[in-house]
Amino acid sequence: MRDAKPVGAAAARSLALPRVTRTALFLSAIVVLGLALRIWFIAANDIDPRYSAADDGDYYQRALRLAATGEYLDNSWLIRPPGHVFMFAAMLKAAMWLGDPTLGIGMIRGLHVLLSLLLIPVGYDLARRLFGRSAGLIFATLMAVWFPLVELPALILSEPLFLFMLTLHCWLLVRWRDSRRVPKARPALWLVGAGITLAMASLARSPAFYSAAFVLGFLLWETWDGGRWTVDGRRWAGWVRRWLVAALAFLVPFAAVIAPWTIRNYVVYERLIIIDTLGPVNLWMSMSDAVNEGRGEGEAKSILAGIPQEQRQEFVSDDIGRILREEPARLVRNFWPHFIHIWKAQFVEDYFVKVSFFTRPLRELWPLGALGDLLWLVFSLASVFALATRPREGGMRLLALGWIGYSCLTVMLIHVEPRYLLPVWLFMALYGAAALGALADWLALRRADRPAATKVARSYLRSPWGLAGLGLCAGLLALILTYRDYPRIIGAGVQRELQRSAGDRAYAAGDTQGAIAAYEQMLAIHPDFVDGRTDLARVYLELGRYDEGWAALGDRQTHRSDMLRGALSRGQGANDRAIFYFEDAEVRAGEDIQKLSLEWLRPTPVNALRLGNGLDFGYLDGFSFGEDGPPDLDGTPRSYRWLQGAGVIELPLPAPLREGNVVRLRAAGGVPGDTPLRVTIGDTTTTLPVRAGEWRTYRIAVPPELEGQQRLRITLAAPTFIPVQLNPAVGDARLLSVMISDVAVE
């Protein structure tokens, strides 16, 4: 007879969902928190690799070409790791398949956010397996909220892939260690994964390649069975055999992933270049005669620029050898200055010490940044206790110390850059979480059994391990606190920000004299603060007091201050100088200078605008760089800009719009046939069929509702294409739509 169906309470029990643990709920909550913080940062961030002349911009441009044509080109300056280019290209290709290449940047950032969030559960399990649940929860929280990791997916697109692969690699090594204790677990598969992930980290940042030596030390530690040595050496032979098997399981996939790239480099350059040439070139730059004698990196770069790409590594290696023979001390001359510069409160440094924010949204996110420095101080000081205690986590101690020492040595030899120190902070955060987790467990013991907790504490503090931890902690704290006069810096910095805020309020209210007074007080506190000088120069620019604007800017340069220099030059009629500053800022700024100039500048009212001549900043946004077209019949030069999908032109007019006014637009298409260009003026949208290869003039009536207004906003939109997809010979991987040379109101 068939069983009866459960009813009532029995039915409810049969449908019960799996029990959700408190740990799972906590991890889910901090993942959501981490996502919210990253979205907050992205919303406030203006930096965009499409406008960058730095690493991210190079990766983006080469990835766009790879996605469009399937052709990989090395950077003209250095042979760089290919990992980021391939990952960027995959996202850009997916955006092309979706029919909207402009989605590419968002998809790249989305993937980086995903990798950043995956660090939270992976980090939890890594720390839990090594040090226990409390350490895992603390480490996961750090992965979610620490400021450098929050800004990483949005700001520094060349690092999230490396950091995720490094963390995943460490987790796989620990999984291999644990699986060796489980019958029929096939632990070698975890080592295969560890080899693949370290190789992928190496193809994102080549220093990871050399950390394979640390992994071999980890395996050597973990394959020792803990027994005593035997006279006949059989136990030693078994240890070596186990280590060799484990090493091969790791090294074979590690080499298999990297080898195709090394072979490609040999085929292209006929040189053994394992991954890149960054390390030797950067070391040579820091040691070169030009830098050593105070002539700067510009001369060193010009020397390399005259040498073929494939010969640069050989040249710098030979010259480093010459320098070491002639002046060995030059290698270590910056060791101590660079070493103490590692141990600084990075957000305080960026916010109050540096001369500019360099477009980073530090002011908008200062609470998170300040919290980040406090967390860094806590986990750094705590980590030395865990790193100095009796090793109980196995070979991970070797791996962590290897990475910390190796990363510190790298920046001591070359230069200190925050992203190069990420492995240091990753492992110090891991061991800081271990120490803080042990403290949390001790506090729980103290609540349950105070005498037992007191005995444990006394035993540890009187042991060599405890004394070593206290000594290292005191030394590190002294190193951090003596590097900067933090109370003075923070106090002065707060006053600077208060004066700046007062100046901003006065400027927004139209009180230019009040704004000038507040900004001058700000600069009296921090004279080298270029961002503040730029704020003051904006006021003088708007007042037409150009000489005072130049004096306010001073000599230090940022891309935003150079944009102001361009505007001041334009106001004084020095057009050639204005073009130089505007176009240089546009190419190298790392943000959309057209958008910024449209927000910041109040250019001269005009009835007609020539696009692409270098003097159109403050009037438009959404266009590519200016280009020269064929001259008019009378020989007059004619410049233009490509619209990049969607853009806007805003014309401040010398007189109000009248009945009968029309907008004159001169445009040409880029792909065969007609390109539909949607032109929106007021509430009216007109679609123009823009013919490819033919410059035509189009006229659109100004809507009646705009009569009497003295500012005209024209919104443009058209489908995009990538020139290199149509003709690989042109090498142009930009997203373009139509060319526009002139806009006028008649």
Where are the language model's segments positioned?
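Membrane-proximal lumenal/periplasmic loop motifs of glycosylation machinery
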Residues: 44-57, 67-89, 322
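Loop-to-helix entry region of an early transmembrane alpha helix in multi-pass inner-membrane enzymes
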Residues: 82, 86, 97-121, 152, ...
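Membrane-interface transmembrane helices that cradle and orient dolichyl/undecaprenyl
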Residues: 130, 169-191, 201, 219-229, ...
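Transmembrane-helix signature of polytopic, membrane-embedded enzymes
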Residues: 102-106, 118-145, 163-164, 182-186, ...
